[in-house]
Regions:
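Polar, enzyme-active/binding microenvironments
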Residues: 126
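Short hydrophobic beta/alpha edge segments that flank linear recognition/processing sites
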Residues: 54-72, 92-95, 102-108
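Acidic, low-complexity mobile loops and tails
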Residues: 1-56, 101-109, 118-122, 130, ...
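Short, conserved beta-turn/loop elements at beta-strand boundaries and strand-helix junctions
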Residues: 21-24, 83-89, 114
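Short beta-strands and strand-coil junctions in structured, solvent-facing domains, enriched
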Residues: 69, 113-115
């Protein structure tokens, strides 16, 4: 898998969720390639229902993968306004194309300016991603 991290995206550093700002309040979410590589092949993906409220740091769904089963943690608070039906039906799309066909959902963020303060973006992405890849390699989570 290509472990690239586009600098125009925002990254939640602990749970490896990426955020794409589509408008002031509409934010597209997905799992970054490092998070996916450490999980292994996704077999099952479930997201909270449309229009449900999600809270930063709380579950917004569940995933089952080759190396782990667990909750998908929300990087922001808001309301789910769109879900990627294709990825829900075929979770392997998340593995194959995490920034494209494998996106997860779009949320309407309550307060992007405040909510995004903990996210990594721009020039900070390169240093963070290199450090994370080294940490994952040292743990044996990726090759």
């Amino acid at each position: 898998m290509d472990l690239t991290f586009p600098k125009h995206l925002y990254y939640e550093p602990e749970h490896h969720v990426w955020c794409l700002v589509e408008s002031d309040q509409k934010i597209r979410l997905g799992i970054d390639p490092l998070g996916i590589s450490s999980l292994g092949e996704l077999a099952y993906l479930s997201l909270n229902p449309l229009e449900s409220q999600i809270r930063k740091g709380q579950a917004m769904g569940v995933l089952e993968a080759a190396k782990m089963t667990g909750e998908l943690i929300a990087p922001l608070s808001g309301s789910i306004i769109e879900r990627n039906r294709e990825a829900l039906e075929d979770p392997y799309q998340v593995n194959q194309d995490p920034y494209g066909k494998g996106w997860l959902c779009v949320i309407e963020c309550e307060d992007w300016k405040t909510e995004s303060e903990h996210l990594i973006t721009g020039e900070a992405v390169e240093a963070w991603s290199e450090k994370e890849m080294e940490r994952y390699r040292s743990q044996g989570w990726i090759d």
